[in-house]
């Protein structure tokens, strides 16, 4: 499972796109990677996609002796890249892939309604409509407000939404830096933390050191 996020250096106006965080199917961190070439645009260029995926696939093969058969890509926000590139790239390796957008900022609120009684939704509750969904990953006491659900959208792939939501929920519960839920899955959550330490992340090198937690 791979996530990347675009990090911005506010002082220099530079974006560091595709800072990737790579996990195996058990939720174990394999590594993270910051590309060498920064960019100023919103769309991640094909050359950077190539750099990122070449490195993460090579690292997976070195660790497990084979390439993954399936990859789930979590995007923080919108995915605007060319799907044809993904199809051609992963097609060469016979790898199935899914692209999932995870949006943490949404005005939607969920509630649990039983007759005339309205309560906060329980952690793990969700609403699905086609390839879009909202899921609650945290508990909040009734007198402290209401939880903020994550907005989930599948933009490519064959995974069903229930499997996607189960994966995202599970990944939000296994943050090693705390006994509490992280709200975000560790894919996007760790990438957020990497962005806050982006100037200390070496370019062009794979690492599994979680100093940014």
Regions found by a protein language model. Name each.
Residues 1-213:
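Long, contiguous domain-sized segments
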């Amino acid at each position: 499972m791979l996530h990347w996020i675009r990090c911005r250096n506010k002082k220099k106006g530079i974006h560091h796109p595709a800072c990737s965080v790579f996990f195996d199917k058990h939720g174990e961190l394999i590594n993270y990677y910051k590309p060498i070439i920064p960019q100023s645009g919103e769309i991640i260029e094909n050359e950077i996609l190539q750099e990122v995926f070449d490195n993460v696939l090579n690292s997976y093969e070195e660790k497990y002796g084979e390439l993954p058969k399936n990859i789930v890509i979590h995007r923080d926000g919108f995915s605007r890249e060319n799907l044809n590139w993904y199809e051609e790239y992963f097609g060469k390796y016979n790898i199935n892939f899914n692209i999932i957008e995870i949006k943490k900022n949404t005005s939607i609120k969920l509630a649990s309604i039983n007759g005339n009684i309205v309560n906060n939704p329980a952690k793990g509750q969700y609403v699905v409509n086609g390839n879009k969904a909202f899921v609650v990953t945290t508990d909040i006491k009734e007198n402290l407000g209401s939880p903020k659900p994550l907005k989930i959208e599948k933009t490519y792939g064959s995974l069903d939404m229930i499997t996607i939501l189960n994966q995202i929920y599970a990944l939000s519960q296994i943050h090693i830096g705390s006994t509490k839920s992280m709200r975000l899955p560790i894919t996007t959550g760790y990438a957020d933390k990497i962005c806050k330490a982006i100037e200390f992340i070496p370019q062009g090198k794979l690492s599994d050191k979680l100093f940014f937690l």
